[in-house]
């Protein structure tokens, strides 16, 4: 009897141990044990990159949010080609891939996809100046795409109904480098996803869209195919919460919200002005920026005056930073038409606005809110923040406030506010424009594409210029 009880006890212990061993062997258990999740991504402006402020990128921030959700550290592993990244996933060196990759049946045979969290479209692009291709029959030059990419898989599918279609593939270049090759005339065509194309056209407006290849392709994270559902099972509630609490929307707005609208003529004029006009004033932007990024100050100035020191609006704002008479007095500007004074005053005023933003609000939301205040005044921005809070959204997030600013033109909203009617819709476009100008200027500056700047010019007031007393 005692022996039988002992056997039962030993059996139960062994079963419990077996369950524990099985539990410890799951992917999620291993991640918890190591206290980190290893995420692979392609290094790019839309996924992951190193900036002055540290690590940045849509997929990086989303991956960090998932790591926080799991309660572990994030180990981001950047790659420069798909083959290496897929191989590392298959070998178990990565827990998942977060790289804005599209779902398709070919990939789904090899990998497991998480929930769809975005959609993109694929476009055929070419350089402005050659005849626009409107379908595959119009392609007369060389078309190149990345090997093993969704673009390659798409073309393989298209070729079944277009047998004359030919293209080459490469693992040496990434998507942005292929776009640059089109600009440089090294290739005639390539395919690009809409979000990458939108970011790239900020500083290369000559890149044009021939026609759409696909529409609304689903984007999802990728895992190894296995019977282990432990990690996959948590992706579903994570993305559900990210959509429910607006986290996905906020990230979309941060990285892509300001680049959805593209104007070829305006972008081309801006790039030209950076090379021809900006060098005259760049020393002053740098000198008076203080803790601000001088390139942000310059982008603000371009939005205000297109770097015209004699600019004037019907409402009485004047100069390269378009200061009102009252604002000029506040910041010690005696002549709004003198560009050095005006730049100094504009920088001082923007800094004051940023300091006025509640300390709890982090960057870059502080700056976007301050830019909106530069346009319509802090009072109106704060009215929009109050409406935002009343509607259950965050008054501290620009992505939420920008959706409510346009409500200030509607009587049923502005009559209940402290400062009343305001063109909040204009303020939203204003901030989006500055963000586009800033992004382009940063890229051109860091790639040494701005002309060498001369000594700051001395601009004497002409007869008839205003000279104001403090």
UniProtKB/Swiss-Prot annotation:
GO terms for biological process: cell wall macromolecule catabolic process; cell wall organization; peptidoglycan catabolic process. CDD domains: MLTF-like (cd13403), PBP2_YfhD_N (cd01009). Its main location: membrane. This is Membrane-bound lytic murein transglycosylase F. It is a peripheral membrane protein. Keywords: Cell outer membrane, Cell wall biogenesis/degradation, Lyase, Membrane, Signal. GO terms for cellular component: cell outer membrane. The gene is mltF. Residues 22-259 are annotated as: Non-LT domain. InterPro entries: Lysozyme-like_dom_sf (IPR023346), MltF (IPR023703), Solute-binding_3/MltF_N (IPR001638), Transglyc_AS (IPR000189), Transglycosylase_SLT_dom_1 (IPR008258).
């Amino acid at each position: 009897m005692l022996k039988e009880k002992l056997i039962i006890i030993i059996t139960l212990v062994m079963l419990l141990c077996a369950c524990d061993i099985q539990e410890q062997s799951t992917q999620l258990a291993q991640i918890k044990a190591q206290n980190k999740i290893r995420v692979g991504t392609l290094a790019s402006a839309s996924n992951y990159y190193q900036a002055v402020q540290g690590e940045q990128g849509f997929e990086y921030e989303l991956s960090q949010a998932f790591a926080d959700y799991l309660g572990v550290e994030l180990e981001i592993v950047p790659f420069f080609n798909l083959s290496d990244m897929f191989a590392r996933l298959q070998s178990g060196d990565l827990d998942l891939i977060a790289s804005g990759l599209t779902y398709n049946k070919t990939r789904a045979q090899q990998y497991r996809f998480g929930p769809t969290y975005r959609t993109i479209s694929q476009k055929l692009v070419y350089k402005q100046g050659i005849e626009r291709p409107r379908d595959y029959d119009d392609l007369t030059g060389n078309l190149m795409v990345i090997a093993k990419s969704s673009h390659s898989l798409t073309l393989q599918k298209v070729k079944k109904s277009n047998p004359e279609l030919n293209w080459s593939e490469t693992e040496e270049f990434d998507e942005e480098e292929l776009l640059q090759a089109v600009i440089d005339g090294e290739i005639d065509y390539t395919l690009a996803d809409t979000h990458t194309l939108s970011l790239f056209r900020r500083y290369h407006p000559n890149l044009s869209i021939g026609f759409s290849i696909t529409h609304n392709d689903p984007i999802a994270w990728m895992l190894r195919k296995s019977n282990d559902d432990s990690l996959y099972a948590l992706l579903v509630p994570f993305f559900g919460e990210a959509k429910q609490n607006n986290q996905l929307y906020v990230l979309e707005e941060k990285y892509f919200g300001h680049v959805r609208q593209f104007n070829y003529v305006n972008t081309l004029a801006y790039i030209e002005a950076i090379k021809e006009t900006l060098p005259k004033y760049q020393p002053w932007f740098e000198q008076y920026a203080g803790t601000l990024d001088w390139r942000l100050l310059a982008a603000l100035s371009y939005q205000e005056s297109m770097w015209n020191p004699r600019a004037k609006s019907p409402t009485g704002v004047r100069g390269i930073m378009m200061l009102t008479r009252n604002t000029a007095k506040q910041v010690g500007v005696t002549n709004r038409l003198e560009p050095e004074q005006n730049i100094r005053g504009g920088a001082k005023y923007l800094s004051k606005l940023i300091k006025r933003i509640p300390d709890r609000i982090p960057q870059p939301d502080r700056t976007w809110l301050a830019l909106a205040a530069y346009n319509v005044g802090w009072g109106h921005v704060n009215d929009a923040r109050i409406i935002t809070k009343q509607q259950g959204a965050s008054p501290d997030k620009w992505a939420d406030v920008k959706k409510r600013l346009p409500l200030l033109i509607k009587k049923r909203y502005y009559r209940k506010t402290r400062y009343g009617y305001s063109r909040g819709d204009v303020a939203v476009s204003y901030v989006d424009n500055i963000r586009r100008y800033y992004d382009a200027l940063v890229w051109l500056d860091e790639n040494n594409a701005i002309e060498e700047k001369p000594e700051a010019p001395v601009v004497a007031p002409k007869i008839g210029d205003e000279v104001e007393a403090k």
